[in-house]
Amino acid sequence: MSAALRFDNIGKVFPGVRALDGISFDVHAGEVHGLMGENGAGKSTLLKILGGEYQPDAGSVLVDGQPVQFASAAASIAAGIAVIHQELQYVPDLTVAENLLLGRLPNAFGWVRKREAKRYVRERLAAMGVDLDPDAKLGRLSIAQRQMVEICKALMRNARVIALDEPTSSLSHRETEVLFKLVDDLRAQGRALIYISHRMDEIYRLCNACTIFRDGRKIASHESLADVPRERLVAEMVGREISDIYHYAPRALGDVRFAAEGIDGPALREPASFSVRAGEIVGFFGLVGAGRSELMRLVYGADHRRAGVLTLDGARIDVKRTGDAIRHGIVLCPEDRKEEGIIAIASVAENINISCRRHSLRAGLFINRKAESETADRFIQRLKIKTPNRRQKIRFLSGGNQQKAILSRWLAEPDLKVVILDEPTRGIDVGAKHEIYDVIYRLAERGCAIVMVSSELPEVLGVSDRIVVMREGRIAGELPREQANEHAVLSLALPQTSAVEAA
């Protein structure tokens, strides 16, 4: 039986980088084929070829045994291919219904039949078990909700071949379970699926087969994962053994470096207070909508704070906007790195140096390009940022390498005191996570107070000295590392009725 989808010796070269080199594997109807590899291994590039965004420089793609070459995304869609990229593609000023039906809204004599469109969307969303308001504007939804819209858009096209790139990176547990059911249903219907994820649990839960990429090459293909240990997949991905991804080691902690008292804002149900000692890593955990990111934005001055007092090294500080926070040595690495973290049109060097340009000025007027280049090269080497050179536009880097560049930006700051990391390893492979944890530990050893917001409970348990748990817009409790385990943390994070049931 011929494969529903075949990649035959695919090659793709960008200036200075061989992104794909001789990639070949099959995906069969009724199969979920996992695709794993470090950031920059070529997984997303392959999906962009499948989706018509890139053209291969070598090899061919076959659908149902027939060679195809998609000159555009529209051609790929017309051939029954649906690709859900990690970078969300939506129109923020349009509604959920309008985004889902973009380009195919029902009309009569040039007029869009909005009532019919909304009814159709509502029925399809209900059938998929997705709770979204068809009238809501996309730009006002959370990242998780926008991601569900993107997934639903692809599924509503009834594609024969569906590729999903890190689809659960922003989803809650409930939304993830909805997605898993959709994937299982699509497999039962005979669709062919490619599933990219760095989360081992998802790969073993969903995938019949799995292919591993490293540095643009296929390292291995497994027709079944039943007898393949996780350690083997990790070693194939990164080319080395990683026995303990978190490699936590206790540190000597100093006095309270940063404290927030009575912080209040629209997203919080009651005022919140917390503190962090010098050299301490405090993990913030909670379900989607718990208010963790919103609290951090209030502390950082990104959103208006109705009340609250901030102290740094025992002295009260006034933070009304982000510039105030940065002047006091407080920085935030945001949850949505593409929208708020990077300057996509700028180079890697410019993104690394943007926060410390005041230290790179010559005569107070001109940027010292030599110092800027030396700083960028130092951190590219130190953090193993995969880029052809420092002049490469950062938008062409993988998510993990973009995140390393953002972290480099703050490592270059000489007066850093407080670092707030919001989902620092979202969508990042196991090898890059290992390196980012090294950066976090390095910052803590410098005496920085670290706040790490994460939706990955194993990460919070593995990295943190202390864990603060939020639930429904308030701080539900905190646990020292010695008392923290999955049951204790989830008992605080879940709504009280669910917590009783879970126990």
Curated annotation (Swiss-Prot):
The lineage of its organism: Bacteria, Pseudomonadati, Pseudomonadota, Betaproteobacteria, Burkholderiales. It catalyses: L-arabinose(out) + ATP + H2O = L-arabinose(in) + ADP + phosphate + H(+). The keyword Ribonucleoprotein does not apply. This is Arabinose import ATP-binding protein AraG 1. It is an enzyme of class 7 (translocase). It comes from the Bacteria. Its EC number is 7.5.2.12. CDD domains: ABC_Carb_Monos_I, ABC_Carb_Monos_II. The complex is composed of two ATP-binding proteins (AraG), two transmembrane proteins (AraH) and a solute-binding protein (AraF). Belongs to the ABC transporter superfamily. Arabinose importer (TC 3.A.1.2.2) family. Its main location: membrane. ATP binds at G37, E38, N39, G40, A41, G42, K43, S44. GO terms for cellular component: plasma membrane. Part of the ABC transporter complex AraFGH involved in arabinose import. Responsible for energy coupling to the transport system.
